[in-house]
Amino acid sequence: MALPVYYDKDIDLGVIQSLQVGIIGYGTQGEAQALNLRDSKVRVRIGLYQGSLSVSKAKKEGFEVLGVKELVQQSDVIMALLPDELHKEVLEKEVIPFLKEGQIIGFAHGFSVHFNQVVIPKGVGAILVAPKGPGSALREEYLKNKGLYHLIAIEQESSKNNAKAVALSYAKAMGGGRMGVLETSFKEECESDLFGEQAVLCGGLEAIVRMGFETLLKAGYPEELAYFECVHEVKLVADLLHYKGVEGLRKHISNTAEFGAIKAREPMGNLLEKRMQKILKKIQNGAFAKDFLLEKSLNYPRLNTERKALKETKIEQIGEILRAPFNHKK
C-alpha cells in the first residue's frame, strides 16, 4: 500500500483511555462512536444543544449529556460529529472560543477544515478519524469483534498531546485497528470522498440507474423488468465488487455479460472520464463547497425540490411495490 497502515498491534489503546472524550452530536455516527468508545473503556460524554431530540436517547443509553460549551471546557478530545454545513456556525460560536492549548478537536470528514470553514487555534490539535462506513456498520462490525477501515490525518499538532497517537488510539477504540487504519491528509480525504460520492457512489450510480430505467421504458419495456435489470440487480454486482474486486466480478458473470460490458465501456469511457475530471476540478477549486454552503444558507431549495420530485417518479413508484416483500421480511 502507498499509505501507511496500522493495526491493533501497532497502536496503544491506553492513549485515548487516559483522556476525556466529548462527542458533539448524537446521530448515527455519533451514537455508534460513543458506544464503541465506551465498550473500549474510554470515558465519553455527549454534547448537545438545549432542546435537541437526541438528549433523551443519549441519556437512555447511559451517557452524560452536557451543553456544547460545557462539553468543550471539560474534555481533552472533542469530536465534531455534526453535518458538514453546520460546522461553521456551531463551532465558531460554541467550540472554538472555548478551546485551550493542549486540547484536540477531531472530525470524521475533512470538509470544514479543508475549505476553511473553521480555523483551529494555535496549540490545539486537529485530527481526522474517518470510519469508512455508516454508523450502523461501524457498530455492527465492532460487536462482531471486527471493524471497518479507518482513515486518520493530522492537520495541526497539539501543544500537550501527540495528535497522531491520539488519532490512532481513537481509531483503535472504534475497532479500526482490527481491519486497518490508514494515514492520509485532510485534503486527500475530503476531495476523494466528495469525488467518490458525486462521480460514482451516489451521483454517478443514481444517474446510470435512472437513465437505464428510463431508456427501457421509452423503448416500451415493462416497468417491472426495467426496475429489475437497472436497479434491483445492482446489489448483486456491488456485493461481488466489494468482496472480490473487478477481476472477481468478471469471473462470476457470464461470457455474454463480460463481453457486453467491454463493448459498452468503449463508447462510454471517454465521455465519463471527461465528466469526472470536471467534477473533480470543481471539488478541488472549491466551487462545489461554495455551491453547497450557498444551498444551505438558502434553506436547501434545490434539495427540497429534488426530494419532492423524486417521490413522483416511476422508478420510485414501481420500486416501492417491488421492494415491499423485502421490507416486510425485515
UniProtKB/Swiss-Prot annotation:
Q: Which InterPro entries is this protein grouped with?
A: 6-PGluconate_DH-like_C_sf, KARI, KARI_C, KARI_N, KARI_prok, NAD(P)-bd_dom_sf
SUPFAM superfamilies reported for this sequence? 6-phosphogluconate dehydrogenase C-terminal domain-like, NAD(P)-binding Rossmann-fold domains
Where do the annotations place substrate binding? Answer: S254
Report the cofactor remark. Answer: Binds 2 magnesium ions per subunit.
**Annotated binding of Mg(2+) 1, by residue:** D193, E197
State its cofactor: Mg(2+)
Superkingdom, natural source: Bacteria
| Annotated metabolic or biological route of this protein | Amino-acid biosynthesis; L-isoleucine biosynthesis; L-isoleucine from 2-oxobutanoate: step 2/4; Amino-acid biosynthesis; L-valine biosynthesis; L-valine from pyruvate: step 2/4
Per UniProt, residues of the KARI C-terminal knotted domain are 185-329
Q: What is its EC number?
A: 1.1.1.86
Q: Which family does it belong to?
A: Belongs to the ketol-acid reductoisomerase family.
The name of this protein is Ketol-acid reductoisomerase (NADP(+))
Q: Recorded GO terms, molecular function?
A: ketol-acid reductoisomerase activity; magnesium ion binding; NADP binding
Q: Where does NADP(+) bind?
A: Y26, G27, T28, Q29, S52, S54, G135
Mind telling me which PANTHER family this protein's record contains?
KETOL-ACID REDUCTOISOMERASE, MITOCHONDRIAL
**GO BP terms, alphabetized:** isoleucine biosynthetic process; L-valine biosynthetic process
The entry's Mg(2+) 2-binding residues are D193, E229, E233
